[in-house]
Amino acid sequence: MSVTLHTSHGDIKVEIYCESVPKTAENFLALCGSGYYDKSPFHRVIPKFMAQTGAPATPNPPENPKGGRSIWGGAFEDEIRPALRHGARGVLSMANKGPGTNGSQFFITFDKAPHLDGLNTVFGRVIGDEGLATLAKMEAVEVDRKNRPKEPVRIENVTIHANPLAG
């Protein structure tokens, strides 16, 4: 299963680990398919660490709270798998505020982040040179003291290449 995140800085094709983390994959793919991530900003970019996105472009509580939401409305549990680690550039992982607080936000690593193993659900990885080149462009964006990009970095839209959830 793969999707392409069409961003303001280029395309990022990602493989989603549907069999290893089915609930996280279902949430991510359903949000992709519904257009939820369209225009979603990368609101945190930390060079040598990660870029975070997944909050709605236009928060509209309570349907779209500022921090985002899952397809089930509330938070959902982690799917920590020992074999899935933050061991490379281009790992996709759920952002959270602690155990069982996953919603819509996720991040893509710029480097290894082993301190997140066991804390955040890894659910995919960047595939292909184009996506890695796009990550390099995103990592080079100037940020303020709070790691917010000084120029817009966002997901424009998403293409799902094969959706096992579609009948």
UniProtKB/Swiss-Prot annotation:
Q: Which UniProt keywords apply?
A: Isomerase, Rotamase
GO cellular component terms, alphabetically, are: catalytic step 2 spliceosome
EC top class named in words: isomerase
- CDD domains this protein is in? Cyclophilin_PPIL3_like
Q: What Enzyme Commission number(s) appear in the record?
A: 5.2.1.8
Instruction: Answer yes or no on keyword Isomerase.
Output: yes
Biological process GO terms, please?
A: protein folding
According to the entry, every stretch annotated as the PPIase cyclophilin-type domain falls at 1-160
Q: Is-annotated flag, keyword Isomerase? A: yes
From the Swiss-Prot or TrEMBL record, what is one GO molecular function term?
Answer: peptidyl-prolyl cis-trans isomerase activity
* Protein name, as recorded: Peptidyl-prolyl cis-trans isomerase-like 3
Q: Which organism is it from?
A: Gibberella zeae (strain ATCC MYA-4620 / CBS 123657 / FGSC 9075 / NRRL 31084 / PH-1)
